[in-house]
């Protein structure tokens, strides 16, 4: 997993509330366990509308997505996080996320940042014309206009994202300690 420390650049100013996982990646794209190729289906129903933010060349390749309230609601589909990541997005900012989406996003190295609605509205305005900087280590989102929005994040999730580790990778960092423990256990309890 790629480490997430500072995410800087333009942001897709989506701003819509209640974007469910079927809008993020429609069900007919879920027939694969391959993470590649899902970006083409990401936000398909929104992209079908003329003038949508995802097809606007000003935002092409934006590493940040700014959404409205209740982003990622609906069914659990890890493909939603995969599709967003494949678009090049490293962080999503919203007033609230579905718990299951937030968990899937974290497990796939996609940072979710919860900010008050007024702060999200300000970022949506800025994102239309200017870049945004998200600093995970200091837990702050900044704009070129001296706006500073602090956010909370679970310390475990923060550590994993900063180090580019998923739960398995974090466990494997302690492989030597695990092996030592298993050796001691085997010698203390040879019958096991």
From Swiss-Prot:
Pathway of action? Amino-acid biosynthesis; L-leucine biosynthesis; L-leucine from 3-methyl-2-oxobutanoate: step 2/4
EC main class here is: lyase
Repressor listed as a keyword: no
EC numbers: 4.2.1.33
Enumerate the Gene3D superfamilies for this protein. Aconitase, domain 4
- One BP term from GO: L-leucine biosynthetic process
Per its UniProt record, what InterPro entries does this chain match? 3-IsopropMal_deHydase_ssu, Aconitase/3IPM_dehydase_swvl, AconitaseA/IPMdHydase_ssu_swvl, IPMI_Swivel, LeuD
Provide the alphabetized UniProt keywords: Amino-acid biosynthesis, Branched-chain amino acid biosynthesis, Leucine biosynthesis, Lyase
Q: Name one GO molecular function term.
A: 3-isopropylmalate dehydratase activity
Q: Which reaction does it catalyse?
A: (2R,3S)-3-isopropylmalate = (2S)-2-isopropylmalate
- Coiled-coil segments: none
Does Nucleotidyltransferase show up as a keyword for this record? no
| Pfam families listed in its UniProt record | Aconitase_C
Tell me a GO cellular component.
3-isopropylmalate dehydratase complex
Q: How would you summarize the oligomeric state and partners of this protein?
A: Heterodimer of LeuC and LeuD.
What family does the database annotate?
Belongs to the LeuD family. LeuD type 1 subfamily.
Q: What does this protein do?
A: Catalyzes the isomerization between 2-isopropylmalate and 3-isopropylmalate, via the formation of 2-isopropylmaleate.
What name is this protein filed under? 3-isopropylmalate dehydratase small subunit
Q: Which organism is it from?
A: Zymomonas mobilis subsp. mobilis (strain ATCC 31821 / ZM4 / CP4)
- Designated gene of the protein: leuD
